[in-house]
Amino acid sequence: MADNKANKEQVHRVFQNISKKYDRLNNIISFEQHKVWRKRVMKDMGVRKGTKALDVCCGTGDWTIALSKAVGPTGEVTGIDFSENMLEVGKEKTASMENVKLVHGDAMELPFEDNSFDYVTIGFGLRNVPDYLVALKEMNRVLKPGGMVVCLETSQPTLPVFKQMYALYFKFVMPIFGKLFAKSKEEYEWLQQSTFNFPGKEELKRMFEEAGFINVRVRSFTGGVAAMHLGYKEKDNTKGD
């Protein structure tokens, strides 16, 4: 496992403090590309109407909202996050959506029954979890057999030109954003470190497979600065035997 045994209290503190400016910060740091990436991921998912989805580390609810629209009024979407303040922002944004429920909880101990959801997503949240593999195994547990898991996260660019740009961005641009938006050095440093230290796409794919997911495929975005991992929980072939 990477050296990302995150301190829960520290991460919780960071997101409690940045909750009200998180959406704006996300837009600026990604140059609003996160919206483009998520739209493409939703297209790849092909979410069916009337299904049940879980958005892990839902934050302020952007992906939760996209899932709500996709499953329609007969479907259900649950968002879960460990930051109460982030959830409060999310609740304001989803107040008119009757098929959405937001709950407080831990990605490594999901408070749901086994085989509960058709889709489980996590967007820009896995890097903030103390143990990636434990969280992925929990996502597998609550996913229905044959269900789909999707992760959209920052990644490590592989193309030389993007690797150079990425390094320059972290060295010169991120500090400016951090000083503008973070209340403390701790917040700024965490936002930077959690992104830069996150595993590359091939290592993360292996983690998905170790967690029990099958047919895992990867799609890179913007030269590899972000990546989608999409996989499935194995179908239960014992039914009907």
Swiss-Prot record:
Signal peptide: none
Known pathway: Quinol/quinone metabolism; menaquinone biosynthesis; menaquinol from 1,4-dihydroxy-2-naphthoate: step 2/2
GO MF annotation: an example: demethylmenaquinone methyltransferase activity
Keywords from the UniProt entry: Menaquinone biosynthesis, Methyltransferase, S-adenosyl-L-methionine, Transferase
Annotated catalysed reactions: a 2-demethylmenaquinol + S-adenosyl-L-methionine = a menaquinol + S-adenosyl-L-homocysteine + H(+)
Source domain of life: Bacteria
InterPro entries: SAM-dependent_MTases_sf, UbiE/COQ5_MeTrFase, UbiE/COQ5_MeTrFase_CS
Residue numbers binding S-adenosyl-L-methionine: T60, D81, D106, A107
One record GO biological process: menaquinone biosynthetic process
Known EC number: 2.1.1.163
Function noted in UniProt: Methyltransferase required for the conversion of demethylmenaquinol (DMKH2) to menaquinol (MKH2).
UniProt-listed HAMAP family: MenG_UbiE_methyltr
Similarity comment text for this entry: Belongs to the class I-like SAM-binding methyltransferase superfamily. MenG/UbiE family.
Protein name as annotated: Demethylmenaquinone methyltransferase
Organism encoding this protein: Staphylococcus aureus (strain JH9)
Source lineage: Bacteria, Bacillati, Bacillota, Bacilli, Bacillales
